[in-house]
Amino acid sequence: MKVSLTLLATLCASLASAGVVITPVHQDQVVPAAQKVAGDCFFGVVTPQGCAPLRT
């Protein structure tokens, strides 16, 4: 049990440090359409930090 909990905590820390954690953003954090480049983001919307799902 302790080993699996340790592995899970290590995985979560690794994903968070790699910037893989997906945080929904608000409309005021989205890059305007005129500044986007085709293929910038295959899901969600483009933000200054990268791609993210839009919070509605």
From Swiss-Prot:
Where does the record place it? Secreted
Q: What happens when the gene is disrupted?
A: Impairs pathogenicity. Forms pressurised appressoria but is hampered in forming penetration pores and fails to differentiate a penetration peg.
Q: What is the predominant subcellular site recorded for this chain?
A: secreted
- What are the inducing conditions? Expressed at all stages of pathogenesis.
First and last residue of the signal peptide: 1-18
- The source's superkingdom equals Eukaryota
GO cellular component terms, A-Z? extracellular region
| Keywords linked to the UniProt accession | Disulfide bond, Secreted, Signal, Virulence
Nucleotide-binding recorded as keyword: no
Function as written in the Swiss-Prot or TrEMBL entry: Secreted protein required for appressorial penetration of intact host epidermal cells and for pathogenicit, but not for subsequent biotrophic and necrotrophic colonization of leaves.
Subunit: Homodimer; disulfide-linked. Dimerization can possibly extend to multimerisation.
The family note in this entry says: Belongs to the MC69 virulence factor family.
What protein name is recorded for this chain?
Secreted virulence factor CLU5a
Species of origin: Colletotrichum graminicola (strain M1.001 / M2 / FGSC 10212)
Gene encoding the protein:
CLU5a
